[in-house]
Amino acid sequence: MARCGAGRAAALGLVLRLLLGLRTGPEAAPAPTSAPAHTLVQVSGPRAGSCPTDTFKCLTSGYCVPLSWRCDGDRDCSDGSDEEECRIEPCAQNRQCQPQPALPCSCDNISGCSAGSDKNLNCSRSPCQEGELRCILDDVCIPHTWRCDGHPDCPDSSDELSCDTDTETDKIFQEENATTSMSSMIVEKETSFRNVTVASAGHPSRNPNAYGVIAAAGVLSAILVSATILILLRLRGQGYLPPTGLLVAVKESLLLSERKTSLI
């Protein structure tokens, strides 16, 4: 009995399956499942030169990116063409090239700002000090001696321009001035020394020591003359000298004292 019940149940299940298959038909058969294929399709977009005016066309891919993304420091195109040649042509959305952020509008006599906005700046330059010169393209003052010294001191190197014809002339002129100045100083010193010497000799009152020398010379001469006369008189009294010899000796002593005085 148990076996008959199991056989009937199996037969009933087979019949039910056949009936379900007939009702659904081949259309209800489940299709084999498969993962959808995600392929990157490169959209060619508009043809070359047909991007909107407010966009930038990537060179390789042809994609159009907003013009504000151009030269913003971020590579938006796959080939990085939106970040190329940014120092040459950093243009804004209205296609008017603006100065770089690192180089703001300045008073350099060059129209680098849009709509001439640099003309509205306060571009009055303060004058350079005496002995200085101003660089041509930069508001920088440097000493005049730095001109044509073989080393560019101006940011634009304008202090070393046109030095082929001026350098030798400037050097010769400076050397001649230096030589003339040295000669003048030497002549002035020699002249001053001579004037001081002559003035000291011609005007004893300007040299206090001259009085002492003259007084000492006069006293010494008087002592010598007096001593000579006393000696000669003593010798004469002892009979050693004739009268004529006394006169000659006195005369010679006087002449000797005068010579000594003139030498002093």
Swiss-Prot record:
Q: What is this protein called?
A: CD320 antigen
Q: Where in the cell is it found?
A: Cell membrane
What's the short name of a Pfam family annotated to this entry?
Answer: Ldl_recept_a
Protein residues bound to Ca(2+) 2:
W146, D149, H151, D153, D159, E160
In which residues is Ca(2+) 1 bound? W69, D72, D74, D76, D82, E83
Has UniProt tagged this entry with the keyword Repeat?
yes
Annotated membrane topology is: Single-pass type I membrane protein
Q: What Gene Ontology cellular-component terms does the record carry?
A: plasma membrane
Could you state one GO biological process linked to this protein?
positive regulation of B cell proliferation
Matches recorded under InterPro entries: LDL_receptor-like_sf, LDLR, LDLR_class-A_CS, LDrepeatLR_classA_rpt
Its biological purpose is as follows: Receptor for transcobalamin saturated with cobalamin (TCbl). Plays an important role in cobalamin uptake. Plasma membrane protein that is expressed on follicular dendritic cells (FDC) and mediates interaction with germinal center B cells. Functions as a costimulator to promote B cell responses to antigenic stimuli; promotes B cell differentiation and proliferation. Germinal center-B (GC-B) cells differentiate into memory B-cells and plasma cells (PC) through interaction with T-cells and follicular dendritic cells (FDC). CD320 augments the proliferation of PC precursors generated by IL-10.
Q: Which PROSITE patterns match?
A: LDLRA_1, LDLRA_2
Lineage summary: Eukaryota, Metazoa, Chordata, Craniata, Vertebrata
Molecular function per GO? calcium ion binding; cargo receptor activity; cobalamin binding; growth factor activity
> Subunit arrangement?
Interacts (via LDL-receptor class A domains) with TCN2.
Q: Which residues form the LDL-receptor class A domain?
A: 50-87, 127-164
Q: Gene3D superfamilies from the entry?
A: Low-density Lipoprotein Receptor
Signal peptide coordinates: 1-28
> Which keywords does this chain's UniProt record carry?
Cell membrane, Disulfide bond, Glycoprotein, Growth factor, Membrane, Metal-binding, Repeat, Signal, Transmembrane, Transmembrane helix
Q: Which parts of the chain span the membrane according to its record?
A: 213-233
**Which cysteines does the record link by disulfide bonds?**
C51-C64, C58-C77, C71-C86, C128-C141, C135-C154, C148-C163
Which residue positions carry a glycan here? N122, N195
